[in-house]
Amino acid sequence: MNNYYLRVIVGASTTFDVTIVADGFSMHDCGVYQFWQKDDNDRIFTVANYPIERTIIESIEYGVE
């Protein structure tokens, strides 16, 4: 698992900080970051989606147990 620390822009001067625990993330053509986890059978399921144009990934902490 990894910790993803995000800053999401909500309005012109409003942001909020988010921490997501996930195995990985993908960038999609539809304009979102998709954060995902794998189950015991290696099936992927979505944990969260955030719009790429309004999301800053500030840091990633790898290998968190």
Predicted features and spans:
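A short beta-strand micro-motif
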Residues: 2-13
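A subset of signal/propeptide-processing and intrinsically disordered low-complexity segments
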Residues: 12, 18, 53-57
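Acidic, low-complexity, intrinsically disordered interaction modules
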Residues: 13-48
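Short, mixed-charge low-complexity intrinsically disordered segments
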Residues: 38-65
